[in-house]
């Protein structure tokens, strides 16, 4: 697969002296096509650059993997990994299986937990570089792609945490590469492979299905519609549906709880933005200086008869997320592919302007490095606060509650040791008999998962919660006494006759809504907790 200029339509190859003419005359009028001369993945300079870039990316993420603490969702997924199932209230099953595999292979230390997301980040950079190379890009296009992807704030953030978001861009880019190749050079075997990738990707996040549908719609509206409306598409859909079916069946059996989570989050939690702001926020999401790259990639795709469908798919995806009031970063996994196409266009457009090439890559790298401490744990907390003040940057409001001193992705990694210590002090007030059958009731899954994971060192009772999957795990029996953290007093008084306030959980760096939480010891239940449990359900 290579990108050629308009001269290629007349049979003139873009090599040697003709390459200079092609770059100057028609670099933006690109057709992407596969032929016998497509570059192989031999150890050429571009391919060596790909593997070097992947290793550097992995090393970068591993260097900062233990600076703060376990993130809220990581702790939750550890709990899910100990209760493997075909589905969960708020996510498909793959992430729990991946976390379980990570725990078995590497252990449960913070550094060990961050190995797989670092590898995923390196894999994304490598696949982006290889995609640029297969489009006909040389070492420069490959390098620009890898730098742009590796230092994009979104990719830096998701690559530093073991959540499903670490793998989502890799699934999306893999689908882009496969469909790109299928449009150029149809092969029967690719359709089942596409279905396999979409199906497994949907077990990671349902958004994979949304991207696949956007691609199908985009291709159907493009001149290349005949390349997708073939029997192979039905085969791909059948494979994808078969793989995703167990999770769909689990959701159906439990009353579609994930839809309740999405609906409640839209009504009660998510920060809604206008369509204009949604579009504007795409620029800083992937590094402001990368915006010309992915915009150039979109323009190049629109001019391509074969691949205009990819640009149309992007438009469909953006419109859909705006209509559904999705978060601004929900379309971010599509950008690595667009950056690769834009990097090839940049390489051809600047063939005779080496100074512009050097300046562009230096500017993208410098901007990415400057933003990096705000996206991934690269600085100790005091230094981070000073860096934010120096840049006059405040934490971005991602949900409809007050922001804290640090960005939410960092706040959710802090305060867990203090929470566990607070719970331990409250449990110490229980009698030996009470402690033998006690539980710790929390207001959300992050608190419950933190106590379950970190509480082992103090032999704390199990955590229970009505939040998301913890609700389905139930009250874990009847309890003579309950330590309640972050649960409204009005809720507790409906269930318990004796309620004693014994402390308060505070942490300077967590979100304000998660600090200054009263701690109660509750005794003398009015009814068995199993009967009251349904009143604690909180799908959000």
Regions inferred by a protein language model and the residue ranges of each:
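Loop-to-helix entry region of an early transmembrane alpha helix in multi-pass inner-membrane enzymes
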Residues: 93-97, 107-126, 143, 158-162
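Membrane-interface transmembrane helices that cradle and orient dolichyl/undecaprenyl
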Residues: 133-139, 175-191, 296-305
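Transmembrane-helix signature of polytopic, membrane-embedded enzymes
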Residues: 31-39, 47-51, 128-151, 170
């Amino acid at each position: 697969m290579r990108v050629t200029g308009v001269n290629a339509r007349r049979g003139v190859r873009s090599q040697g002296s003709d390459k200079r003419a092609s770059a100057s005359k028609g670099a933006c009028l690109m057709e992407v096509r596969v032929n016998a001369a497509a570059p192989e993945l031999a150890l050429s300079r571009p391919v060596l650059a790909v593997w070097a870039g992947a290793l550097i990316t992995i090393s970068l993420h591993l260097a900062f993997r233990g600076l703060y603490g376990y993130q809220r969702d990581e702790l939750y997924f550890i709990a899910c990994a100990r209760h493997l199932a075909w589905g969960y209230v708020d996510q498909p099953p793959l992430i729990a299986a991946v976390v379980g595999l990570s725990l078995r292979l590497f252990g449960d230390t913070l550094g060990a937990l961050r190995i797989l997301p670092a590898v995923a980040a390196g894999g994304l950079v490598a696949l982006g570089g290889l995609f640029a190379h297969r489009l006909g890009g040389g070492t420069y296009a490959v390098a620009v792609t890898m730098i742009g992807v590796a230092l994009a704030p979104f990719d830096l953030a998701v690559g530093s945490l073991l959540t499903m978001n670490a793998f989502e861009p890799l699934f999306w880019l893999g689908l882009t590469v496969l469909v790109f190749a299928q449009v150029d050079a149809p092969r029967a075997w690719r359709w089942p492979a596409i279905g396999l990738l979409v199906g497994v990707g949907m077990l990671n996040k349902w958004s994979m299905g949304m991207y696949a549908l956007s691609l199908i719609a985009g291709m159907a509206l493009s001149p290349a519609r005949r390349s997708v409306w073939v029997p192979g598409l039905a085969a791909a859909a059948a494979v994808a549906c078969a793989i995703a079916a167990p999770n769909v069946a689990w959701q159906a059996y439990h009353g579609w709880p994930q839809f309740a989570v999405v609906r409640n989050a839209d009504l009660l939690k998510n920060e809604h933005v206008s369509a204009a702001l949604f579009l504007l926020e795409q620029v800083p999401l992937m590094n402001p200086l990368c915006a010309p790259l992915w915009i150039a990639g979109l323009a190049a795709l629109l001019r391509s008869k074969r691949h205009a469908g990819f640009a149309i798919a992007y438009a469909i995806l953006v419109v859909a997320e705006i209509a559904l009031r999705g978060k601004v970063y929900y379309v971010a996994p599509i950008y690595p592919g667009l950056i690769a196409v834009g990097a090839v266009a940049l390489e051809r457009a600047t063939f005779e302007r080496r100074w512009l090439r050097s300046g562009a890559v230096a500017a993208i790298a410098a901007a990415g490095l400057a933003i990096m401490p705000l996206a991934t744990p690269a600085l100790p907390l005091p230094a981070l606060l000073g860096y934010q003040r120096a840049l006059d940057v405040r934490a971005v409001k991602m949900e409809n509650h007050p922001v804290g001193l640090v960005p939410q992705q960092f706040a959710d990694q802090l305060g867990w040791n203090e929470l566990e210590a607070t719970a331990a002090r409250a449990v110490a007030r229980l009698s030996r008999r009470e402690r033998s059958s006690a539980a710790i009731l929390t207001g959300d899954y992050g608190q419950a998962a933190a106590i379950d994971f970190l509480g082992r060192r103090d032999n704390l009772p199990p955590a229970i919660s009505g939040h998301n999957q913890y609700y389905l795990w139930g009250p874990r029996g009847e309890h003579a006494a309950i330590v309640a953290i972050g649960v409204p007093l009005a809720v507790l008084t409906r269930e318990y006759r004796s309620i004693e306030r014994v402390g308060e959980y505070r942490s300077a760096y967590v979100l304000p809504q998660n600090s200054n939480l009263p701690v109660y010891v509750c005794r003398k239940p009015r009814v068995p907790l199993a009967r009251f449990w349904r009143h604690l359900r909180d799908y959000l």
